[in-house]
């Protein structure tokens, strides 16, 4: 039964438009996992998604004049192995920026 508990894993997926804010959040999560004696692997960078929007510059004619805007979504994965109850409580109380989307799987 103890081997089943040792094989437990928490997978945290993080998404953000700002890469620096995402890296700071990853550092906070890894630091929290290390202080509670859990093993953290990551952050593993995933491919960045680029979404490009094409907009007409003029409100009337001039279809040849266009402007491009893009959003980049940076993504990371962190795996936490053998989490304890303290680890889960510490991760729940962790204060992360609002610009970072967090998805947790047990």
UniProtKB/Swiss-Prot annotation:
<dbReference type="InterPro" id="IPR036838">
    <property type="entry name" value="Ribosomal_uS10_dom_sf"/>
</dbReference>
<keyword id="KW-0689">Ribosomal protein</keyword>
<dbReference type="Pfam" id="PF00338">
    <property type="entry name" value="Ribosomal_S10"/>
</dbReference>
<dbReference type="InterPro" id="IPR001848">
    <property type="entry name" value="Ribosomal_uS10"/>
</dbReference>
<dbReference type="InterPro" id="IPR027486">
    <property type="entry name" value="Ribosomal_uS10_dom"/>
</dbReference>
<dbReference type="GO" id="GO:0000049">
    <property type="term" value="F:tRNA binding"/>
</dbReference>
<comment type="function">
    <text>Involved in the binding of tRNA to the ribosomes.</text>
</comment>
<dbReference type="GO" id="GO:0006412">
    <property type="term" value="P:translation"/>
</dbReference>
<dbReference type="GO" id="GO:0003735">
    <property type="term" value="F:structural constituent of ribosome"/>
</dbReference>
<comment type="subunit">
    <text>Part of the 30S ribosomal subunit.</text>
</comment>
<keyword id="KW-0687">Ribonucleoprotein</keyword>
<comment type="similarity">
    <text>Belongs to the universal ribosomal protein uS10 family.</text>
</comment>
<dbReference type="GO" id="GO:0005840">
    <property type="term" value="C:ribosome"/>
</dbReference>
<dbReference type="GO" id="GO:1990904">
    <property type="term" value="C:ribonucleoprotein complex"/>
</dbReference>
<protein>
    <recommendedName>
        <fullName>Small ribosomal subunit protein uS10</fullName>
    </recommendedName>
</protein>
